[in-house]
Amino acid sequence: MSIVYNKTPLLRQFFPGKASAQFFLKYECLQPSGSFKSRGIGNLIMKSAIRIQKDGKRSPQVFASSGGNAGFAAATACQRLSLPCTVVVPTATKKRMVDKIRNTGAQVIVSGAYWKEADTFLKTNVMNKIDSQVIEPIYVHPFDNPDIWEGHSSMIDEIVQDLKSQHISVNKVKGIVCSVGGGGLYNGIIQGLERYGLADRIPIVGVETNGCHVFNTSLKIGQPVQFKKITSIATSLGTAVISNQTFEYARKYNTRSVVIEDKDVIETCLKYTHQFNMVIEPACGAALHLGYNTKILENALGSKLAADDIVIIIACGGSSNTIKDLEEALDSMRKKDTPVIEVADNFIFPEKNIVNLKSA
């Protein structure tokens, strides 16, 4: 347990229909910020602040750029640690989220159409204007930092402890399902599994939505790619790139990748919300979708699940949606066919070897 994040429950979840396995949900939606990001971002901020305060020469101040959940996690951690915090969000960020961040006491600046533009503004127009003689900045990337991954890995410590307390062998765990955006959560899960010698024994199923499936595309191509635009409704998963560490881990370990459609995710979110009285956003619904659709999960794992097999789903949380948002999104999708973005038209390579890769 930490001052910046909560120990969350690992609970058995019964999904409708005939059970093909035992599902356990890790309820990261119960974090201070409503999402798993409180673990990693809180860890980064706390470690950095302790180091700066121990040095005693300057005062720590946090600077974050985010489309929502990461910025809110940073602001929430700073509220608990009594640290000043500035968050730059893009114009696409909902007013509800802007207000939530601001209500923690953080300064919120709205700039740029997308996260990358907000991040550039933060670095060039905010951070470079601070008095570096007095302030030592703590820059918070949404996902690409080892301290963030270290913080996320703590959920595996809790999972192992909870299984042990329930007298359940980790050998029964046939997979961990998580949503993948930039890869911060995924990296943390891998590092946690490595700590217990389980990384090469328990496969991870990474779930994305079509239109922000950078992880899936990178694995298919065989190298990290960058998307030109994000078209999925799961904006919390909407990053143009994954971290290099994510790609390396996925190549090293037995990771599976699943891509599902926005409409399916929204339907899952509403289904879960109505059944369990808990609002979830599409980024979280992507992982939960496999609990409702075990055939997809079994295809990803490459084997049938037995009744006593265990699958853990990370309910990663998020605070960007209301029930009304989900219902309006689904209604809009039903009125018109959502276009499928062709992968070949939506990514660029970091290197000029496309022809060689395609012919390989």
Swiss-Prot record:
Acetylation as UniProt keyword: yes
Residues the record lists as N6-(pyridoxal phosphate)lysine modifications: 37
GO CC field: mitochondrial nucleoid; mitochondrion
Chain positions found as N-acetylserine: 2
GO molecular function, one term: threonine deaminase activity
Biological processes annotated in GO: L-serine catabolic process; threonine catabolic process
Reaction(s) catalysed by this chain's protein: L-serine = pyruvate + NH4(+); L-threonine = 2-oxobutanoate + NH4(+)
Subcellular location: Mitochondrion
Chief place of localization: mitochondrion
Needed co-factor(s): pyridoxal 5'-phosphate
Pfam families: PALP (PF00291)
Enzyme Commission code(s) on record: 4.3.1.17, 4.3.1.19
Source superkingdom: Eukaryota
InterPro entries recorded: Ser/Thr_Dehydratase, Ser/Thr_deHydtase_PyrdxlP-BS, TrpB-like_PALP, TrpB-like_PALP_sf
Key words of the record: Acetylation, Lyase, Mitochondrion, Pyridoxal phosphate
Misc remark: Present with 36600 molecules/cell in log phase SD medium.
Record family assignment: Belongs to the serine/threonine dehydratase family.
The protein's name in its UniProt record: Catabolic L-serine/threonine dehydratase
Source species taxonomy: Eukaryota, Fungi, Dikarya, Ascomycota, Saccharomycotina
